[in-house]
Amino acid sequence: MHSWLLLAEAATPKGGLFDLDATLPLMAVQVVVLTFVLNALFFRPVGKAVEDREGYISTSRAQAKEKLAQAERLEAELKAQLLDARKQSVAVIQQAEEEVDRLFREALAVAQSEANSVREKARGEVDAEKAKAFSGIDAQAEKLSSLIVDRLLAA
Amino acid sequence: MLLHLPLAELEVGHHLYWQIGNLNIHGQVFLSSWIVIGALLAVVVLGTRKMERDPRGVQNLLEFLWDYLRDLARDQIGEKVYRDWLPFIGTLFLFIFVSNWGGALIPWRIVHLPSGELGAPTADINTTVAMALLVSLAFFYAGLSNKGLKFFEYYVEPTPIMLPFKIIEEFTKPLSLSFRLFGNILADELAVAVLASLVPLLVPLPVMLLGLFTSAIQALIFATLAAFYIGEAVHEEAH
């Protein structure tokens, strides 16, 4: 049945456990050929894939680190800007308050002085009118008294 | 060499011989090695067909394997030249691993061969010696191509007294590499076969699980030692 496997049974050697024969060099050649075949089919492509991935991972890691550093720098910068802006806004508010205060005081002072002067003037006028009225009354009283005297004397 | 047991026969050392010219080869080793190599290549082709940056399915497994083998090669050989040797170390590991596990998991007994039987290709001494000799060749090639003739300073370092030991080591390295793998896998297959022939149900299961464990460990040991030897050859002394 398996006679095709028996290429030549005629001069079969004795055999044995330590039967070294042409199997040895042929097996050596087979292993060497297998080395080249596996190098082409296995070691080179898989090595390339693994090393490519290692390269990809290390470059993306470096990139990510760089981006993180950039983000941190940006954050610090923005925080500083924010602090600056806050300080500025506080200063502006303070300034505005002071300005308002000053303007209010100025306006108040102006209004007060104006009111004072108007009042003074009004008082002066009142006094003058009073004086004038008094002097008019005096003259009329004198006239009346002289008229009365005249009438009495004439009677 | 037949091992006679009360319930079943266990064949050891029987081979399916193919003849090419004047040369005999073990057909069952090649048949089973083609099957496990085919399975390995099928997984690889399936997993690399559509590579994506977000891995999916089999690609995950392949990337895990690649990463594992890269770490193994890099730890033993060093950052500088491990890339040149990763395919060789990785192929040794993958081939031994799928051979060992294939030998343990595929029901080879379904197929009846005229002689011998299918099993893990690594349970044949020819396979393991072939790979161990390739490691030795790789050792010298790596040393000579990286350092030129200065590579031979390795034999007199740290002191020339080491010379005979280091020369002996060149012979013991492939010997221990090949016999460790061969012995472990064959012993595992035999233990499972013997237990299965005595008690066919349940009892062999723990031994089979242990066999899977040792199979994986043996693949790791072979690949690690091969990488370590190559690393020794290319190692730069800090003078």
From Swiss-Prot, chain B:
Record InterPro entries: ATP_syn_F0_a_bact/chloroplast, ATP_synth_F0_asu, ATP_synth_F0_asu_AS, F0_ATP_A_sf
Record has Acetylation as a keyword: no
Primary localization: membrane
Lineage, highest ranks first: Bacteria, Bacillati, Cyanobacteriota, Cyanophyceae, Synechococcales
Keywords: ATP synthesis, CF(0), Hydrogen ion transport, Ion transport, Membrane, Thylakoid, Transmembrane, Transmembrane helix, Transport
Subcellular location as annotated: Cellular thylakoid membrane
UniProt record similarity statement: Belongs to the ATPase A chain family.
Full protein name: ATP synthase subunit a
CDD domains: ATP-synt_Fo_a_6 (cd00310)
Biological role: Key component of the proton channel; it plays a direct role in the translocation of protons across the membrane.
Transport in keyword set: yes
GO molecular function, one term: proton-transporting ATP synthase activity, rotational mechanism
Transmembrane segments: 27-47, 86-106, 125-145, 190-210, 211-231
Organism: Synechococcus sp. (strain RCC307)
